[in-house]
A protein has these predicted regions:
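Acidic/glycine-enriched connector segments
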Residues: 1-64, 140-331
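Boundary/linker segments of alpha-helical solenoid repeat arrays
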Residues: 22-24, 28-30, 64-73, 105-117
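"A position-specific structural signal for the A-helix of alpha-solenoid helical repeats
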Residues: 39, 80-87, 117-118
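Regulatory cytosolic signal-relay segments
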Residues: 321-354, 379
Length: 535
């Protein structure tokens, strides 16, 4: 960790010094200096080099004051000056500056949330523990809300969320969002609750993060067009205006309801991940009749949420229906609820998929293993991992090795997380220098989760796993920093919702191997690795 911290500090210092060399003292030059300067100060402070932290904090504050004199007032200038004062231990001036920043016209909720996170990190390192509480009071919460709920009723079913209930439901959503102070929303985009929530969040000027379980066109057929009317155009509109759109998989539905469950888990995980980064508990808003429901439904989601967080904010549709008793039903123009791409029997037209976690590992400097030490390497690498596999509570779904590489598929994410960190520690803390002609033997480990195809492999004579999500896990592995575990954003989200023993750091939006594309990648750690007290 400290090795990568040194690299980050050096990068910010290089950026700051480069701007200093080019500076002519003009406003546009100063505006390029304060950001790398305060980041160097923050990094030095976090890694306990107070002298350098103070040096850069003073420089950053002076740059901000010069910018202000030249008429360059902005939220970030004010927030940077506040952070510099806090690093310097000047708590009173820092709190005053933070309050001024939060009240500025260009203070967007996402800006304030980011500033709050960094301020709390600094405050947690100050000897006087009351300072953190004072800093918390200087900022409003972001108001993170995940939402789910019933879709508009299919024609002919018992009334639960009929089309004519839409306006009353929207009013109740507006009231709930006011109560929760919502500025950041997470939801899928089915007709009914989801789209109403996303539209209302957009009207409030909030962020909207949309999650779809599979390909867009098939989602429209399963979960939007069924309601008739203008729901499809409204679906397109909320996606067009969304802050982000995430797909659990870009493939089709194929009658696989487990994708709805995974989508719920990922969506709640993203909300939890946002709250985790900001030291803020997210909230859940649902339109729900209190019944368990089907796979991937609202009842399943509420049960999972209650196991991890607070009580959800529930809008009961049964309380809406009495107000509609004298209303004329709104006509529904589409009675077709069965997706055209499913067979009459309801079976998938494709092979069976299942949700799995994939782990790839290989050893850096394997080519430097001395020939006469090959048998010893096999005992260390294969033998060591074999013992770890025996200690797992469940047998993996699949294991394969070739040379210095290792591939394993898990039914349970917990098993993959446990094994990944055990392998990492086994290599990081072992003494393997005698095996190599030169270099250091370190392991690279990658993980991803998603729906994969399970097929009989005629070469291995046993079942094997295939598909894009297997490929994605494999393409992460070559870019892993030696001695580390890199995981996909999906895994990071799942960790955030229900895996309290694990943590992660954002590594960046990285280009994966073999032109697979750029993806957000995270470095897996155990909870408390940074000195943070575990609850």
């Amino acid at each position: 960790k400290f090795r990568y911290a040194d690299l980050a500090i050096a990068r910010y210092e290089d950026a700051y010094n480069a701007q200093l060399q080019k500076s002519s003292g003009k406003l546009e030059d100063l505006e390029k200096q304060y950001y790398p300067c305060i980041n160097v100060a923050f990094m030095h402070y976090v890694f306990h080099d107070e002298k350098k932290a103070h040096e850069y904090a003073k420089a950053a504050r002076e740059i901000c004051r010069k910018i202000r004199v030249k008429g360059g007032e902005s939220y970030w200038i004010q927030a940077t000056e506040a952070e510099a004062s806090l690093i310097l231990g000047q708590v009173g001036p820092a709190l005053e500056a933070y309050a001024q920043a939060v009240g500025m016209e260009d203070a967007k909720p996402s800006y304030v949330a980011s500033t709050r996170k960094q301020a709390l990190q600094i405050a947690s390192l100050i000897e006087d523990k009351e300072v953190k509480g004072e800093v918390e009071k200087a900022f409003p919460l972001m108001g993170i809300v995940a939402c789910s709920g019933h879709v508009i009723d299919n024609p002919g079913r018992d009334r639960r969320f009929p089309p004519e209930a839409e306006m009353v439901a929207k009013e109740k959503i507006e009231q709930a969002l006011d109560k929760l102070g919502a500025t950041c929303g997470f939801s899928s985009a089915a007709c009914g609750t989801d789209i109403l929530f996303l539209e209302t969040m957009a009207e409030r000027g909030g962020e909207t993060h949309v999650f779809l379980p599979f390909a867009k066109e098939e989602f429209i057929e399963t979960s939007v067009r069924r309601a008739g009317g203008n729901w499809v155009s409204r679906f397109e509109s909320v996606l067009d205006h969304a802050t982000s759109v995430h797909y659990v998989t870009n493939e089709g539905y194929y009658g696989d309801d487990s994708l709805f469950s995974l989508c719920n888990q990922v969506m709640l995980g993203f909300a939890a991940m946002r709250g985790r980064g900001l030291d803020e508990d997210p909230n859940l808003l649902v339109i729900w009749d209190g019944k368990p429901g089907s796979t991937g439904g609202t009842g399943e989601l509420v049960e999972a949420w209650r196991g991890e967080f607070n009580e959800p904010e529930v809008i009961d549709p049964r309380e809406i229906l009495p107000s509609l008793s004298d209303s004329e039903p709104v006509p529904v123009y589409s009675g077709e609820t069965r997706p055209a791409f499913l067979s009459e029997s309801g079976e998938s037209e494709s092979s069976i998929r299942s949700i799995k976690t994939m782990l790839f590992a290989d050893v850096q400097a394997f080519s430097q293993v001395m020939e006469e030490k090959t048998a010893e390497f096999v005992e260390i690498f294969h033998g060591g991992i074999a013992k770890m596999l025996e200690r797992l509570p469940r047998e993996p779904a699949f294991v394969n090795t070739w040379g210095d590489s290792f591939f394993v598929v898990f039914d349970e994410l917990e098993d993959a997380l446990k094994l990944a960190l055990e392998i990492r520690d086994y290599f990081n803390y072992g003494e393997w220098g005698d095996l190599l002609s030169e270099g250091v033997m370190e392991v690279r480990i990658s993980m991803h989760a998603g729906p994969v195809y399970e097929e009989f492999d005629p070469i291995l004579k046993k079942r094997n796993f295939f598909g894009r999500h297997v490929n994605q896990a494999a393409r992460i592995e070559p870019i892993v920093l030696p001695g580390s575990v890199f995981v996909s954003e999906t895994v990071a989200a799942l960790i955030s919702f229900g895996y309290d023993d694990y943590d992660f750091e954002y590594a960046g939006n990285l280009e994966l191997a073999k032109d697979f594309g750029s993806y957000p990648i995270y470095m897996l750690q155990r909870r408390g690795y940074s000195g943070e007290k575990s609850d």
